[in-house]
């Protein structure tokens, strides 16, 4: 998860936090399993041409707007943003679909560029007009940029469908848990196993993978008892594997994520906020998330909500 987490009570002691989700490599990697394994009817392709320009919202853009929205993204985070398509090199995901839909409402072209996650916010207003990369809304970020809320996400555990080992999300001591390297869950897994040891229970064996697809594959294949990931990632794993994976327990530490705009660009901020609200009101945003098998759509595009 790309945020500062609030840990569950089980893992509160000795926990470390990350300000964002990163991978070991700065290069984007495809998010779908190789050779089509585990594919399902999701994602449902989104056609941005079905979204029309709203003239009164487009008129809110700054007078010096050049006609193209440049969007900074970190294409390593399926199903939100990753490289996919027939060539495996096309920016894909619900955040990418959202960027295209915003462009349609605003009557603008959209250019999505990959960047290291930590480099996006410093480049807002210079290299990029917007950052749409699963940025959780935090006080630290609100001090630097404007953020428009659009989705809510948290952390989830996932197990093979039917929970064959009868696991309880409140006590995963003694299990083998898979996480993607560099995520918040990677750090939280250490805190979880430390809490088990403090309670005199068997530790969690944490297996780390550079690719989320590898985590999911090993869960389905039986090498893992449980997977720990962001809620959209877990939901996507469920549909990607044709229901071979299911959520265990509730979503934890859910928090809103926001579209990032430069603090001093009031006109662009207001235009993007209005465009986001339009997509919420007309059902397009819900349609995009439904197409990816993901929940968490917000109904109000709030500017700089309290974090």
Which residues make up each language-model segment?
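Extracytoplasmic small-molecule ligand-binding "clamshell" domains
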Residues: 30-131
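Periplasmic-binding protein-like
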Residues: 152-159, 239-275, 294-307
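Extended ligand-binding regions for polar small-molecule ligands
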Residues: 22, 34-52, 96, 104, ...
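Acidic, polar ligand-binding/catalytic clefts
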Residues: 109-170
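A ligand-binding cleft/hinge motif common to bilobed small-molecule-binding domains
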Residues: 119, 135-142, 190-191, 221-253
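Bilobed "Venus flytrap"/periplasmic-binding protein-like clamshell domains
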Residues: 89-104, 135-137, 156-211, 226, ...
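Ligand-binding clefts/hinges and TM-proximal coupling segments of bilobed small-molecule sensing domains
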Residues: 40-61, 187-206, 277-307
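Bacterial lipoprotein signal-peptidase II cleavage site
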Residues: 6, 18-33
